[in-house]
């Protein structure tokens, strides 16, 4: 039951983008096409899951036992950067079109505050290894879900007549706000778990 609660809260109630406002740059930058959003969601899911596992093990196995918690942020950033490089190499070989579409946003996963934020939150919440992995995967799914829904709406907005003053970023921000309000409808459900 604890894990179900973590999943529901991470995906819907405390969605990392729509409630905690982490990862806004890729959320706005890669959300013009659904295909790109799916690719970015998959890349973030992979990096976030592996980064959380590695950073958790480093924190509990090296940093805490040796009193090196002050190296937490730099260690986590190095782990994330290494994983992003690995994803970039794999995507370049496996799916060159997706690699081209993601463009500059793929290396930006390194500085995506979602990845670092989740790695730090897992430590702050004092989750176990299993709970931290459930939280990481759920957070990544929540990010991908919000990104895919938002990109679907933006594709539809591209086909409609939007007043000139509202085209581009203004209508995207208004849409993101409405989407965030829709996700607020899930607040309170976390009390069940």
Located regions from the model:
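Ordered, amphipathic secondary-structure segments that act as subunit-interaction surfaces
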Residues: 60-103
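Juxtamembrane boundary at the C-terminal end of a transmembrane helix
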Residues: 2, 181-193
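Juxtamembrane transmembrane-helix termini in multi-pass membrane transport proteins
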Residues: 6-43
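Small-residue-rich segments of transmembrane alpha-helices in multi-pass membrane proteins
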Residues: 43-53, 103-118, 168-180
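C-terminal ends of transmembrane helices
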Residues: 22-36, 84-98, 150-161
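Interfacial loop-to-transmembrane junctions
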Residues: 155-173
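Generic transmembrane alpha-helix signature in multi-pass membrane proteins
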Residues: 21-29, 88-93, 104-106, 113-126
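Structural signature of hydrophobic alpha-helical transmembrane segments
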Residues: 3-18, 67-82, 133-146
């Amino acid at each position: 039951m604890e894990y179900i609660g973590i999943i529901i809260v991470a995906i819907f109630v405390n969605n990392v983008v729509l409630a905690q406002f982490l990862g806004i740059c890729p959320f706005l930058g890669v959300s013009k096409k659904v295909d790109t959003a799916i690719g970015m969601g998959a890349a973030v899911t992979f990096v976030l899951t592996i980064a959380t596992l590695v950073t958790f093990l480093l924190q509990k196995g090296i940093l805490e036992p040796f009193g090196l918690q002050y190296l937490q942020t730099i260690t986590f950033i190095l782990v994330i950067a290494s994983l992003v490089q690995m994803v970039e190499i794999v995507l370049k070989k496996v799916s060159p079109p997706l690699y081209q579409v993601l463009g500059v946003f793929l290396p930006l996963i390194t500085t995506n505050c979602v990845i670092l934020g989740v790695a730090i939150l897992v430590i702050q919440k004092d989750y176990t290894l299993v709970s931290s992995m459930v939280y990481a995967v759920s957070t990544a799914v929540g990010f991908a879900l919000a990104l895919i829904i938002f990109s679907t709406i933006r594709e539809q907005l591209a086909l409609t007549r939007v007043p000139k003053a509202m085209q581009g970023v203004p209508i995207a921000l208004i849409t993101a706000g409405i989407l965030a309000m829709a996700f607020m409808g899930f607040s309170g459900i976390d009390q069940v778990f």
